[in-house]
A protein has these predicted regions:
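Glycine-rich adenosine-cofactor-binding loop
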Residues: 1-18, 117-138
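NAD(P)-binding Rossmann-fold cofactor-contacting core
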Residues: 7, 140-160
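A short, well-structured beta->alpha microelement
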Residues: 14-29, 52-53, 163-170
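Rossmann-like adenosine-cofactor binding region
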Residues: 35-39, 49-62, 157-224
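Phosphate/diphosphate ligand-binding glycine-rich loop within oxidoreductases
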Residues: 40-101
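Adenosine-phosphate binding glycine-rich loop
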Residues: 79-118, 205-247
Length: 247
């Protein structure tokens, strides 16, 4: 049995994928949204309290979510269930980052009037998403400037011929045509962003208070839901397989 608290094509694709894998017929799988909650109490886009999920743990049950609290995970385990927090699954995070970067490139190619080689893109953050996005943009011929607080990263980028600047309030953005934020925390204040600069924010939360930006949180679920669902399904499959090997 598979019960999903997320609706839409991503969840449908995940369920379809899991329906094809070899697993114990008695195994129950509970899929919680990605991310699972915003307020720490209710499941995202529902009126269901997250602790109500505990009532579904009957026999061998796997609960899969994203950003789950320690207390919730402990409660699941105390009832005999198993917990997969996708936030701790590096393979999932990498695959999701690749999809996010690919979606972002798709947005740029379909909403700008210039070829990549004629655009200078500022990428804020050089984590999983920022790194893959930078590589894709460079491959397409775009000019890229990476904004990151890590001095070692800036040194490495410089050795590869990639422009970079320290992420701070007085960073120079005068030569940037487009700014893409991948960092989870606010770095630039609205007054430091050049007037008229297009800003795309891939992170959740309000990172550019007072500034109009294009928000694309969880963009794979919107643009590539079938692939996003398979990434989700593969994570659950790995978890189940690992549990079987360790049993």
């Amino acid at each position: 049995m598979i019960h999903s608290y997320e609706n839409g094509k991503r969840a449908e694709s995940c369920i379809e994928y899991l329906g094809r894998i070899e697993r114990d017929d008695t195994l129950r799988i509970v899929l919680l949204p990605i991310p699972t909650t915003r307020d720490g109490k209710t499941i995202l886009n529902t009126k269901v309290y997250i602790n109500e999920v505990l009532d579904e743990i009957i026999g061998d049950t796997v609960v899969c979510g994203y950003g789950l609290t320690d207390s919730f995970c402990e409660a699941v385990r105390s009832r005999g269930g198993r917990v997969l927090d996708l936030l701790n699954d590096e393979d999932f995070l990498i695959e999701n980052a690749e999809l996010t970067a690919l979606c972002t490139v798709g947005i740029l190619l379909t909403t700008t009037e210039y070829a990549p080689k004629d655009v200078t893109v500022g990428v804020v953050g050089y984590g999983r998403i920022g790194k893959r996005l930078t590589n894709m943009l460079l491959y397409l011929g775009a000019n890229v400037r990476v904004y990151t607080t890590r001095e070692s990263t800036r040194t490495d980028l410089g050795e590869c011929g990639v422009a970079s600047s320290k992420s701070c309030c007085d960073a120079d953005m005068s030569d940037i045509d487009l700014l893409i934020n991948t960092a989870p925390a606010a770095i630039f204040s609205a007054e430091k962003i050049p007037h008229g600069l297009r800003v795309i924010d891939l992170a959740s939360g309000e990172n550019f208070a007072g500034l109009t930006v294009e928000k694309y949180p969880s963009v794979p679920a919107k643009m590539l839901p079938k692939s996003a669902g398979r990434v989700w399904g593969r994570a659950v499959e790995r978890f189940i397989s690992a549990a079987c090997r360790n049993a």
